[in-house]
Amino acid sequence: MRNVTRSHMVLHQIQSVLKKYEEVSAQELYESLDKGTVQREFGVRSVDLSRLSVSEEQFSELLLLFKLYSDQQQQSSIEFVATVPSEVDVRLRKTIAVIREMIHGAQNTILVTGYAVSEYVDEIMERVLEKALAGVNVDIFLDRNPQTDRYIENIRGRNLPSNFNVYVYKGSQGYSSLHAKVIMVDEEKAFVSSANLSYNGIVNNIEIGTLVGGEKILVIKNVLLELVKNNYFEKIIWYA
């Protein structure tokens, strides 16, 4: 029991140091360890190691191992997702389950792009609106078509918050429609799929997508922001 308690104390101290120096790279930490300066540069000497029964060298090495593990966890991750017949055993999560989980878990931002938004996904889009009302910043990018018009008219006149933004693709010569299907939450995870936000896309068609994590997904948002900047989208104004 004593060893378990000590392990928790060591872990807590390591996490505290890593949080304090989270901007420092693992390479910098390794170089300091190699030079024998990690104790001074990273505040290890301020830690009461006598209570932990570890030496400065042991603590520093553990610090580096946890930093390497933390950096590895933050790198890009990919999970495949599919809409397939129930009798097909592909051991992949279903599209609808992933979409609901992402929206439910969003804390800061939600970004949605789609070609079609049918009545079938009204419940999902309602959850997105509820998140906006709770303070989550929402940006929705849609193609111009009858389904988009229906969705906009359905929510127009409601008490929509200023952080709930809908952009409609204007169309341009050579680029006839917005066909990208992406859901991104908290700028940490992006679901990129062939599936439209419709019954066919989520239930009836065979669709494959990827759930991607990591900093590289911000490229998606940057592309959309550049399109907005270059006047490819019309922002819907809810109030005159």
Swiss-Prot record:
<feature type="active site">
    <location>
        <position position="179"/>
    </location>
</feature>
<keyword id="KW-0963">Cytoplasm</keyword>
<protein>
    <recommendedName>
        <fullName>DISARM protein DrmC</fullName>
        <ecNumber>3.1.-.-</ecNumber>
    </recommendedName>
</protein>
<feature type="domain" description="PLD phosphodiesterase">
    <location>
        <begin position="174"/>
        <end position="201"/>
    </location>
</feature>
<dbReference type="GO" id="GO:0032049">
    <property type="term" value="P:cardiolipin biosynthetic process"/>
</dbReference>
<comment type="similarity">
    <text>Belongs to the phospholipase D family.</text>
</comment>
<dbReference type="Pfam" id="PF13091">
    <property type="entry name" value="PLDc_2"/>
</dbReference>
<dbReference type="GO" id="GO:0051607">
    <property type="term" value="P:defense response to virus"/>
</dbReference>
<feature type="active site">
    <location>
        <position position="181"/>
    </location>
</feature>
<comment type="function">
    <text>Component of antiviral defense system DISARM (defense island system associated with restriction-modification), composed of DrmE, DrmA, DrmB, DrmC and DrmMII. DISARM is probably a multi-gene restriction module, this subunit is probably a phospholipase or nuclease. Expression of DISARM in B.subtilis (strain BEST7003) confers resistance to phages Nf, phi29, phi105, phi3T, SPO1, SPR and SPP1. Protection is over 10(7)-fold against phi3T, 10(4)-10(5)-fold against Nf, phi29, phi105 and SPR, 100-fold against SPO1 and 10-fold against SPP1.</text>
</comment>
<keyword id="KW-0378">Hydrolase</keyword>
<dbReference type="GO" id="GO:0030572">
    <property type="term" value="F:phosphatidyltransferase activity"/>
</dbReference>
<dbReference type="GO" id="GO:0005737">
    <property type="term" value="C:cytoplasm"/>
</dbReference>
<keyword id="KW-0051">Antiviral defense</keyword>
<keyword id="KW-0680">Restriction system</keyword>
<dbReference type="GO" id="GO:0009307">
    <property type="term" value="P:DNA restriction-modification system"/>
</dbReference>
<dbReference type="InterPro" id="IPR001736">
    <property type="entry name" value="PLipase_D/transphosphatidylase"/>
</dbReference>
<dbReference type="InterPro" id="IPR025202">
    <property type="entry name" value="PLD-like_dom"/>
</dbReference>
<dbReference type="GO" id="GO:0016787">
    <property type="term" value="F:hydrolase activity"/>
</dbReference>
<feature type="active site">
    <location>
        <position position="186"/>
    </location>
</feature>
